[in-house]
Amino acid sequence: MEGPRSDVGRWGRSPWQPTTPSPEPEPEPEPDRSSRSRRGGGRSFWARCCGCCSCGNRADDDWGPEPSGSRSRGTSSRGGGSRGGDSRGRDSRGGRRPESRGSGVNAAGDGTIREGMLVVNGVDLLCSRSDQNRREHHTDEFEYDELILRRGQPFHIILFLNREYESSDRIALELLIGNNPEVGKGTHVIIPVGKGGSGGWKAQVTKTNGHNLTLRVHTSPNAIIGKFQFTVRTRSEAGEFQLPFDPRNEIYILFNPWCPEDIVYVDHEDWRQEYVLNESGRIYYGTEAQIGERTWNYGQFDHGVLDACLYILDRRGMPYGGRGDPVSVSRVVSAMVNSLDDNGVLIGNWTGDYSRGTNPSAWVGSVEILLSYLRTGYSVPYGQCWVFAGVTTTVLRCLGLATRTVTNFNSAHDTDTSLTMDIYFDENMKPLEHLNHDSVWNFHVWNDCWMKRPDLPSGFDGWQVVDATPQETSSGIFCCGPCSVESIKNGLVYMKYDTPFIFAEVNSDKVYWQRQDDGSFKIVYVEEKAIGTLIVTKAINSNMREDITHIYKHPEGSEAERKAVEKAAAHGSKPNVYATRDSAEDVAMQVEAQDAVMGQDLTVSVVLTNRGSSRRTVKLHLYLCVTYYTGVSGPTFKETKKEVVLAPGASDTVAMPVAYKEYKPHLVDQGAMLLNVSGHVKESGQVLAKQHTFRLRTPDLSLTLLGAAVVGQECEVQIVFKNPLPITLTNVVFRLEGSGLQRPKVLNVGDIGGNETVTLRQTFVPVRPGPRQLIASLDSPQLSQVHGVIQVDVAPSSGGRGFSEAVGDSRSGENIPMAFRGGA
């Protein structure tokens, strides 16, 4: 695509122009996925435990593309055997794994096993979903068979030895990550059994049973996150032994919000359940007065998603030594979820033409997007703010950070760091479009993640804003955050990262400037409550909406809020902006829009009230246009002029009826319209100015479960949709997705006639028990933003198995006939 500022519908400075087809996304270089060659050495046991000389494959990227439909997984080895059956020889993403390296090695490196040596025949990492480790680490929902741990928390393993363990024997566990593991960088961890390791790493023997040895291993709360290779070394009087690396024994380590020593620690269990473990959520959109909500499948535990999240860090080239720092990790994620600069996950598109990809409104979750990126290495078309935010929530929750998706209504986009939203008019109050670069988005979606901020002074821990939507550059790249919400609330815009930009999004003033006869500009009106009018997120343990505006800003109009705004503006590019303000206002104006469904007629109204003691005459001008949710509007398609006389204390209403046939030819994404109102009070010279955005609602999909849902057993869902428009919807596409229920599925259903009702039935096989969300969407060139969701309570299988290896069909582009078609 062209540079980001060329996107119609996104950048306020871009002129309105007809939609043109998007060019094919540029192909990206295929990532290097080759395994590194093995290194060896013949030095002493402890010398060979350092990163520069221990042998073995040190690569963290020994994987290939996942074959379509592949679900193979590795398992722990026991005496060289496999519990994985058909997973042997493949890595966790379905790609070919390197073979195990045969017998263990002795000090000479020749593979000779001498009598009396302590040989490790195998290791059981107790890594199945029902085992103690996965349950205690809250990773049992991951659809992986490898051991997945949260740092700073102990786990247990069993070593299978060739003889009984003796007090003179020495055992060391090793964890290695990256291409050149080094002890000093934390990428090569040595854990001597029975001795305290460095940085919180240690291991103790908890049980001996013949030749079996049970160990309790403690990981560091500051450990690097990622996928580690695991091996064991022993030393006895007869010699030294190293267990060969087995890819089935790879260990994933994640951040741990359950660990008080981890800087991502969250001291509320209900928060952890919601912001770390919940696999679905609500994302809010629309306008403050007409809030829409959509369910999003985060799917952070789906098979392949964890590998996709780690691949994002690899693709950025993030140094392994920095991967233990949540500040650095979240900042990299904010850069990599968008494709600009670094060929990240999603290509942004605000043009309205999505013919070469997927309409951002059609996505129902993150899984399809992340697995496509992992499988191909290419950026996925297309995303807008809620898609970037939904994927970011998935990535950060998957890696162990408590994260939520946040919507800010009337979100400012400050392009000149003035920390005000500036709108310029000529002498007749006609907008000067060539100067109006700032814009106000109807809504904007970003993320909050919870962590301490050791890089900032005290008092700035807690929620941090991370925004992956590419709007402005930070340190030369398109990323944003993490930024302390506390610094935003108090106008401390000098705190890193990107506080000025985010402050302007939530608490800047909307300043109207009028050109004077001498060419200078004067402030004629200030809207102090127009920006960041409502900030919301999904409530904990509920599908209700939670208002979190108060954590971002002091009460609107309060002394503390005004001080925060003026303090922030003093650090902006127009520090004296408030010095020229005039105030003489006794006529109030309020805009109201009828709540209407797309396809219906509607009415918008302006209510004027004279709060003074004298008669007032108001000349009013209303003009209506369609608008993208980013605040970029099209040409006016209807306008009204009227003069209103108001007695003291009186009110009057100016109404503008709008028929479907009037707005239909002009509609763009989100079905939003913008009413611009400007006016002038003859007697006092007061200037009236208001921009009011409203949207047309779209219908929902109705989902019904036909029968009970049981793990491993096929069940059926019925989807019903009624076309609200009198025109035919062409090339209609349904999407289905639900963690533990249905892998991402795309269904092509053809055309749907005007006002027609259609019924679609689909089968799926649940793979995990418990309450689940099955989410669907409908998209066509004529109608988008149509969604539906149903909760599915999945029972365990009759055999008592909590999980199933069955996988919902993930076919894409399947042509599906309708089960039933009916009239209006």
Swiss-Prot record:
Q: Which SUPFAM superfamilies match?
A: Cysteine proteinases, E set domains, Transglutaminase, two C-terminal domains
Task: Please name the GO terms that the record assigns under molecular function.
Answer: identical protein binding; metal ion binding; protein-glutamine gamma-glutamyltransferase activity
Q: Which SMART domains match?
A: TGc
| Localization (cell) | Membrane
Give GO cellular component annotations, separated by semicolons.
adherens junction; membrane
Superkingdom of the organism of origin: Eukaryota
After translation, how is this protein modified? Palmitoylated.
What broad class of enzyme is this? transferase
Q: What is its EC number?
A: 2.3.2.13
Q: Which reaction does it catalyse?
A: L-glutaminyl-[protein] + L-lysyl-[protein] = [protein]-L-lysyl-N(6)-5-L-glutamyl-[protein] + NH4(+)
Keyword Repeat: yes or no? no
Q: What does this protein do?
A: Catalyzes the cross-linking of proteins and the conjugation of polyamines to proteins. Responsible for cross-linking epidermal proteins during formation of the stratum corneum. Involved in cell proliferation.
Name of the protein this chain belongs to: Protein-glutamine gamma-glutamyltransferase K
The species this protein was found in: Rattus norvegicus (Rat)
Q: Source gene?
A: Tgm1
